[in-house]
Design a protein with these regions (language model features):
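Bacterial Sec-dependent N-terminal signal peptides
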Residues: 1-25
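Glycan-binding loop/region signatures in secreted carbohydrate-active enzymes
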Residues: 92, 237-304, 330-339
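Short, charged N-terminal beta->alpha structural module
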Residues: 24-26, 345-375
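A glycine-rich, often tryptophan-bearing local segment used as a flexible ligand/cofactor-contacting loop or short
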Residues: 359-364, 368, 400, 405-485
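Substrate-binding surface in catalytic domains of secreted glycosidases
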Residues: 31, 59-71, 115, 136-267
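A short, well-structured beta->alpha microelement
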Residues: 36-40, 368-391
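Conserved, mostly hydrophobic/aromatic
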Residues: 51, 90, 131, 160, ...
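Glycan-recognition patch characteristic of GH18 chitinases/ENGases
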Residues: 24-121, 333
Length: 486
């Protein structure tokens, strides 16, 4: 009897513990870093709960903050009109951002800096401050450092909390190892901690595996979470950072554009690390040359966040994503919408003449059947439909079936040209036809190769970064879908 009672008590305690450490879906956060130098594209404000605007820097007199591109910060803050629940912080620091050590070294400097942070929060209508000091006591990034930095970091958090008050947010970004910071001393001042779950190695190792595998670099995400918890950060105060970019040789234009286009020129093959739960590209020798994430691995990481009872996820940074925002959509649907790792649908746009024909109906039906099997949806539009700005960017593939493209208005033509020239997606034209009055399209179509559909072809202008395009091949829809790996 006594044994049974003990077991019952232990079960109740375990259940209570799980309930208390697991972040509830309504409380879960998704933090997006938005960079000051990416002011040509604002983020979609409904896909995250928090934005960290990067960056501000400690000023040269160690007693205040300099903000990069203040007009863009104002535009980011204005996104609250579209999502009033959105929280926006100024992130101060970043790799090679210095003057932290000198600022944190004296009470006078810390107090002045903290007061300036509060002034900026009030001036711009911000919700708080994020500190990204990389890293206390370390001069690896070419910044000044002192053995006293760890102690002074805690004092800085104390002084920032005092200046900001309890109604404003105070967060930090940390290295996966949980080094350089006395978390037990300073976590009480923090709302949460953003683990930078990326950049832990270079090829031939992967920089962001969930679990340790033969391809893992310095540390896995699992080990990084464990290190933070061991050093005093409760799971409900942790967010796990995920990259929206790949890591490898960025001077290689094919690899550098892979995250945007999803295609290579045939020299590289995509593989999956079943232990680390991440994809990667290998060259002809089988060597890893590009470590990255895709919807499958982002969904796996989000599920791991849920399973570990963390507060949420974070990512760097919004413009590294492709035009369809696959990374951001995966993280949003997984953590905020469905409460489980979810791979979002891809999207195919079929352009038709609007006139019914047996051939067109068969192609559309075939695409819809394929979509149910391969996880994409199909939108069919007549050639005289109205288009909103950035409409084409929603789609991973535009399938030009039998539309009369001469009916597209000037605005729609500009959007289509951007879609093509900036590699925002793939295009397939079932027939090779000129478009009266559209010189750009006629030049573009003449430059394309006819795809035999037995290998992936790039256009002759691949060096300009254009995506994979096919014109003039009467291929079946299934062949096109297979070619584009939808």
């Amino acid at each position: 009897m006594k044994t049974n009672i003990i077991r019952l008590v232990m079960l109740v305690f375990t259940a209570f513990t799980m309930l208390t450490v697991t972040a509830k879906p309504k409380d879960r956060v998704v933090v997006a870093y938005v960079c000051s130098w990416t002011d040509l594209r604002l983020p979609a404000p409904t896909l995250m709960t928090h934005i960290n605007y990067a960056f501000g820097h400690v000023n040269k007199t160690f007693n205040g903050v300099d903000i990069q591109n203040p007009p863009f910060l104002e535009k980011v803050v204005a996104l609250k009109k579209k999502n009033p629940a959105l929280k926006i912080n100024l992130s101060i620091g970043g790799w090679t951002s210095g003057n932290f050590s000198e600022m944190a070294a004296t009470q006078a400097n810390r107090t002045a800096f903290a007061r300036d942070c509060r002034r900026i929060v009030d001036k711009y209508g911000l919700d708080g401050i994020d500190i990204d000091w990389e890293y206390p006591t370390s001069n690896e990034a070419g910044i000044s450092a002192s053995p006293d930095d760890t102690k002074n970091f805690t004092l800085l958090m104390r002084d920032l909390r005092k200046a900001l008050g309890n109604k404003k947010l105070l967060t930090i970004a940390t290295i996966q190892d949980a080094l350089y910071i006395d978390f037990r001393a300073c976590v009480k001042y923090l709302d949460f901690v953003n683990i930078m779950g990326y950049d832990q190695s270079n090829p031939p190792m992967h920089h962001t595996t969930i679990h340790r595998s033969p391809l893992s670099g310095h540390i896995s995400l699992e080990e990084g979470i464990d290190a933070h918890i061991k050093n005093g950060v409760p799971p409900e105060k942790l967010t796990l950072g995920m990259p929206l970019y790949g890591r490898g040789d960025h001077s290689n234009k094919i690899l550098d554009k892979f995250m945007k286009t999803g295609f290579t020129d045939g020299r590289y093959v995509e593989r999956w690390d079943s232990i680390g739960e991440v994809p990667y590209l290998v060259d002809k020798t089988g060597k890893l040359v590009w470590g990255f994430d895709n919807p499958r691995s982002w969904a796996a990481k989000c599920q791991y966040i849920i399973d570990r009872g963390l507060l949420g996820g974070m990512y760097w940074e919004t413009t590294e994503d492709n035009a369809q925002r696959d990374g951001q959509m995966t993280i949003y649907e997984s953590l905020l919408k469905n409460n489980k790792g979810t791979i979002p649908l891809k999207h195919v746009l079929v352009l038709t003449s609007g006139k019914s024909s047996v051939e067109a109906s068969q192609v559309v039906d075939e695409l819809k059947q394929l979509g149910m099997k391969r996880h994409f949806d199909v939108t069919v539009l007549a050639d005289d439909a109205a288009y909103t700005p950035e409409y084409f960017d929603r789609f991973h593939l535009i399938y030009q079936l039998n539309a009369d493209l001469s009916k597209l208005g000037n605005e729609a033509r500009k959007e289509f040209e951007t879609y093509v020239d900036a590699s925002h997606g793939a295009f397939f034209a079932a027939k090779d036809t000129a478009v009266k009055g559209w010189d750009w399209y006629n030049t573009f179509s003449q430059d394309l190769r006819v795809c035999p559909l037995n290998q992936k072809y790039w256009s002759n202008t691949a060096k300009m970064g254009r995506n994979l395009f096919c014109v003039g091949n009467n291929a079946k829809a299934e062949e096109v879908v297979e070619l584009l790996n939808l």
